[in-house]
Amino acid sequence: PEEQILLKASQEVVRAGYPHLLIIAPRHSDRSQDIARLMPQAAHRSKNQLPLLGDNHFLADSFGEMSSLVTAADIVILGGSFVPKGGHNPLEIAALSTPLITGPSQFKNKIEFDTLQQYGQCITVKDGATLVKQLTIWLEALRTDGRAIPQDNLDKACAYVKQACERPTKTARLIIDRLPTQHHPN
């Protein structure tokens, strides 16, 4: 599964001298037990456990905390993209100004991924090896510059998300404007 790719990459990044906390937050809670078996030493949020200083992994298998996790993160690796599932929607990550790494499977949200990559907020990696390389680049930037990517890139991505969120309202207005006007008898 995808989590094995992430866990292996995380171990390699730690060995390269970049300690970090990998938080795996499954999109579907029914996957928590399978993921927990892959990382038996990790604290589990569903058991009211929190990671300790020096822990490398944490299973955030709770509901309603994703935006808090993303806000606290220096980098997000978006799932559903290292296996042929099409990638999860990257707009929430971009809206919270967090640098994003994604795998190659992006067919569900291709336009959003392409646009965020143009703004420099998102990077696509092809496999675990290129994930390790990109993580070490951004973690080194965090270490030396205090940020993985320039704030200007994050600001541009945020502006794009704001425009994207306006799309449904604009579409609804176009539809409503084309509806025939009916006269109701008094």
Descriptions of predicted regions:
Residues 1-186:
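Nucleotide-activated sugar donor-binding and catalytic core shared by glycosyltransferases
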